Amino acid sequence: MQLLIDAGNTRIKWALTDINHVVGEWHAMGNVVHADLGKVKQAWSALKIERVLISNVAGDAVAWQLRKILVELNVPDASLTWFRAQAECAGVRNAYAQPTQLGSDRFASLIGARHRYVGQRLLVVTCGTATTIDALEADGTFIGGMILPGLATMATSLAVNTALLPSVDKADRARVFADNTHDAIISGCLSAQVGAIMYAYEQRTDPHARCVLSGGAAQYLGPYLPMPFDAVDNLVLLGLDASVRGDAY
């Protein structure tokens, strides 16, 4: 059994999978915020972990904590792999000027989207602490993308003071022309996010291009998008799982 870990900027997500089963078929899964990372030890202690694959964009401190927990669970270093972007993996060709500079989470998301929608032109949008918008060609070539502050990050940066700290969980009730500062911040941030996604989608110049939406803020942005899209949960974990299978699909 293989433990897949997506260590993001805000949360740590994980899933247990069997490489002999269908990609994305989880035997167990969960997620915690960084402050609660120690709690995964109890959950993982009940699992039969033979190998571990980690995508980490959360920094060295989180990497150290993860390794410490795995050592305490008697998982040998030889069984641990840190997933990183490369020139090519699992049907995705990375056209970044320096392929290894692409974030491991973005690369895994592209692999996950490619696996789910093989042979289709895609716009892969992940909505978390940052919003990333990446273009994937039908042949699996990642041609590039854009990064902007995520919905909550953008809203927080515009807060006038703590009393007006915007709550993005009310984004589904936002009006374009708000009659108060709190809602005006939410409206502006939503418009910026949706506008970036729409602009990127228009640049694909293909009516058959598919928009794939993932991440915690996807539920708030989706209702405002004018184009069809598919919401896919845990795209990074799906990509990590697919990467283990190589080019088999």
What function would you assign to each model-found segment?
Residues 2-6, 53, 122-126, 212:
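Short glycine-aspartate micro-motif
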Residues 36-51, 73-74, 197-210:
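Phosphate/pyrophosphate-binding loops at sites that engage ATP/ADP/AMP, CoA/4′-phosphopantetheine
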Residues 48-58, 79-83, 207-216:
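Short glycine-rich phosphate-binding loop at a beta-alpha junction
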Residues 173-210, 217-220, 228-229:
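Adenine-nucleotide phosphate-binding core of ATP-dependent small-molecule kinases
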Residues 229-249:
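Glycine-rich phosphate-binding/hydrolytic loop that grips phosphoryl groups
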